[in-house]
Amino acid sequence: VLSIVDLLEQWCVDRAAAGQKILGLCAPPGSGKSWLASQLQIRLSVASLSLDDLYWPQPQLQQYQRGLPGSHDLPLLKQVLADFRQHGKAMAPCFVKGLAAGAGDRQGQRPLVGDLLLLEGWCVGARGVPTLQPYQAIWQQLDGLLLLRPPSYGRVMRWRLQAEAKQRQQGGGALTAKQVAAMVLAFYGHLPAEKCFAPLWQQPQLPTWQLQL
């Protein structure tokens, strides 16, 4: 039986063979997007960029709720994607969630080099509410989109709590259970799954594949 990493690897190989360069990965908070991307980097010439790395630095980030539309530096993200498409490499900021008492902040940069660039995030590709409109120019730069669908959106809370617990064990700042609950409720209150995510597989606007988690 193929693992989800095996399936993702084959998907990337097929997309690269089709001449695609920049792919999107949309999956719920705490579902292991960054871990999956890191596994692909071991197996393939894939550069991985998290939408989280494009959060505004402090203190600008304090004007937004982290993770919601508006909290990302879209002009910089657009430039990073354009550089990668043109040159096969780019420089991207690093966002460390354990800084600023768990609120997170930017810390340095890192190179993106590979045959493919995977942009991963919980709302990559999403549409359907006005606050997502500025993001559509970003999504239009994607050659394809993979959706990892949770068995239920109630499972997302548990996954996010586990992710924060792991971050705490590693010595970084982490959100409390109350803060996690508020964050996840805000995420799906602001971007309802039925309105912002269901259309991605029901009425796709770019080549789209999906896997059930």
Each model region followed by its residue ranges:
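Conserved NTP phosphate-binding and transfer environment spanning the P-loop NTPase/kinase superfamily
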Residues: L116, C123-L213
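Charge-patterned, long linear interaction tracts outside catalytic cores
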Residues: R106-V124
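Short loop/turn elements that form and flank the Walker-type P-loop nucleotide-binding site
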Residues: A18-G19, P111-V113, Q140-Q141
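Hydrophobic positions on the alpha1 helix immediately C-terminal to the Walker A/P-loop
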Residues: L36, L40
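Conserved nucleotide-sensing/catalytic segment adjacent to the nucleotide-binding pocket
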Residues: A47-G104
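Conserved lysine of the Walker
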Residues: K33
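Anionic group-transfer/hydrolysis microenvironments
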Residues: C26-P28, L54, W122, P151
